[in-house]
Swiss-Prot record:
Organism annotation: Pseudomonas savastanoi pv. phaseolicola (strain 1448A / Race 6)
GO molecular function terms noted in the UniProt entry: 3-isopropylmalate dehydrogenase activity; magnesium ion binding; NAD binding
Record carries keyword Oxidoreductase: yes
Binding locations of NAD(+): 76-89, 282-294
Gene behind this protein: leuB
EC primary class: oxidoreductase
EC number(s) reported in the record: 1.1.1.85
InterPro entries linked to this entry: IsoCit/isopropylmalate_DH_CS (IPR019818), IsoPropMal-DH-like_dom (IPR024084), Isopropylmalate_DH (IPR004429)
Protein name per Swiss-Prot or TrEMBL: 3-isopropylmalate dehydrogenase
UniProt subunit comment: Homodimer.
Entry-linked PANTHER family: 3-ISOPROPYLMALATE DEHYDROGENASE
Annotated positions binding substrate: R96, R106, R134, D224
Cofactor: Mg(2+); Mn(2+)
A Pfam family it matches: Iso_dh
Amino acid sequence: MSKQILILPGDGIGPEIMTEAVKVLELANEKYQLGFELTHDVIGGAAIDKHGVPLADETLDRARAADAVLLGAVGGPKWDTIERDIRPERGLLKIRSQLGLFGNLRPAILYPQLADASSLKPEIVAGLDILIVRELTGGIYFGAPRGTRVLDNGERQAYDTLPYSESEIRRIAKVGFDMAMVRGKKLCSVDKANVLASSQLWREIVEQVAKDYPEVELSHMYVDNAAMQLVRAPKQFDVIVTDNLFGDILSDQASMLTGSIGMLPSASLDTANKGMYEPCHGSAPDIAGKGIANPLATILSVSMMLRYSFNLTDAADAIEKAVSVVLDQGIRTGDIWSEGKVKVGTQEMGDAVVAALRNL
């Protein structure tokens, strides 16, 4: 029986980078006889334009029926003035929550070929390989009540809620420990337990889960210190587990240690490792349609999909090897280009990865 993959290009540069990722996926499908069937649909602004909502019910049904979802990016200034609850980003939040994609894996890896691209000194970031495990469907982004109210003095006050249940914390902590077990057996849990009640429960539950993983060295760090340490000495970290808000911020910070967010994929998984895969970067509307966006993060998201949702290690390794070969050849999109390298556009980069994969 064939495996179903839903392709959601999204907005901005999403369709451009997705075209290249699909080329790589189709070659891998043929080369390794993976038996994938691809279907395409819309999400975000593209869905608003077509259906009037950022995620149509039929699209959500297709996502539920699929074995994995590959996403480009959502959002753009075209939709910034519409009602908040139907903006493109709400489609992304909805598909995550409706599919139960609670565990977000965001690697921050510095490719040796791109050591000069980081804004930090080479000796600080050389060999960097961090995995941030972010809780994705709880916390302040989904908490209620939220809104704006008028105080007795006539002033408006906005408020949000940051709730976490024991079960939500326990399941994401388990993902963090599981990832640590197959990596360096080190896990740093990041919270704000000196201030937030939700973080105090977070720390308590993480400590409980740690008893099931005696081989893993567990440490705790406040989020403000973690942000500082990511810049001061990032290689002290191997796996970081944290909540939705902190993970959103820290994973973007960690991505820039590598020199370009355009290189970094991500995975969002449910309890059975069925997942949605997307680049860490956004829709970059300022460069959309120019053919200069870096497709490598989306291509590497295909590799993560093969690895985590389908356990196709050989095919996943081959795609990562193909990307490394292309970087060895000095081929670069503008965001990772440096003097003496060959600057190419989106399509040329995709073609180069396809050629490298074909020759492996």
